[in-house]
């Protein structure tokens, strides 16, 4: 499949402790590269603080990266005038991302008014068609967001993102706050939309079980750096990077000794690790040696599988 969305060497830092005499910056993303193919669901995994949401904001142009380039269909984002129409985002909390003062019809009509020149009749037709696609009742368009369940609000958020027929939807922890049964419904909806209309998804999550269900490929992010990427089958059945192995051990029922809580404790000082030389994971890696402390491992790619680790021999 052709590459649709590509990020090359994206880096992002933020100013902290600013004051009268200046401040210091903390690197949150460091040379992150990824490719999203047409009609694909690519998952980005990593625990809190790994840079997942920051990466999402760069990919939808909510923020500008410090360096690197993002392209859509081979064209730089900067040269695409309607980029916000072609790449849309779904946020984690629909209650916060949906204006509580607006009815469903207004929420769905707003992007059509702002980003298209469609007349009112065509906007209405598209709104009702999109409601049908996400499984919402047309008779509910006059309701406000607070009148819906969490799963229904997330369907509204999905409808709002897809109503412009974007090429890519970036989903940032969009199902993490939902209970298991509602989560399954939303995941099924995402897969159906991909299969029926060929929409590409970049699915950001910390939940490995979700990735197993929904994704074609997975990219593992740690301390703002890519540790490993490849097909879900390859990466999860034969993890090459020690951090990926640790993540998989944390999944309940995996047989690993770690707990899900332990994974959240892997990065006690992410900011400091990002600023130091060498492998970002070396402080927690049982295989780390002096080479890992002095040099950052390059990303090695073979047949669509990539890993950044000096200790990995064959994958």
Predicted regions and their residues:
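Charged, flexible cofactor/metal-binding loops and thiol motifs
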Residues: 17, 231-315
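ABC transporter nucleotide-binding domains
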Residues: 1-237, 307, 313-315
């Amino acid at each position: 499949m052709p590459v649709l969305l590509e990020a090359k060497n994206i880096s992002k830092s933020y100013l902290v402790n600013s004051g009268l005499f200046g401040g210091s910056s903390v690197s949150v993303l460091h040379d992150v590269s990824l490719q999203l193919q047409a009609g694909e669901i690519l998952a980005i995994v990593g625990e809190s603080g790994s840079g997942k949401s920051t990466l999402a904001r760069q990919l939808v142009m909510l923020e500008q990266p410090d360096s690197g380039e993002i392209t859509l269909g081979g064209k730089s984002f900067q040269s695409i005038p309607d980029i916000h129409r072609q790449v849309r985002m779904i946020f984690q909390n629909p209650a916060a991302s949906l204006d509580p003062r607006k009815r469903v019809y207004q929420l769905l009509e707003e992007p059509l008014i702002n980003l298209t020149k469609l007349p009112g009749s065509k906007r209405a037709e598209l709104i009702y068609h999109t409601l049908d696609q996400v499984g919402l009742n047309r008779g509910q368009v006059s309701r406000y967001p607070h009148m819906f369940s969490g799963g229904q609000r997330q369907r509204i958020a999905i409808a709002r993102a897809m109503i412009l027929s974007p090429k890519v939807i970036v989903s940032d922890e969009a199902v993490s706050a939902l209970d298991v049964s509602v989560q399954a419904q939303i995941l099924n909806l995402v897969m159906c939309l991909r299969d029926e209309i060929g929409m590409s998804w970049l699915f950001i999550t910390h939940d490995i079980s979700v990735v197993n269900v929904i994704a074609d490929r997975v990219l593992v992010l740690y301390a703002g750096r890519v540790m490993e990427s490849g097909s879900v089958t390859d990466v999860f059945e034969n993890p090459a990077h020690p951090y990926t192995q640790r993540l998989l051990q944390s999944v309940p029922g995996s047989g690993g000794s770690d707990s899900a809580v332990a994974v959240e404790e892997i990065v006690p000082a992410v900011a400091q690790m990002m600023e130091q030389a060498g492998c970002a994971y070396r402080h927690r890696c049982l295989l780390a040696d002096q080479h890992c402390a002095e040099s950052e491992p390059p990303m090695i790619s073979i047949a669509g599988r990539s890993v950044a680790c000096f200790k990995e021999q064959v994958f």
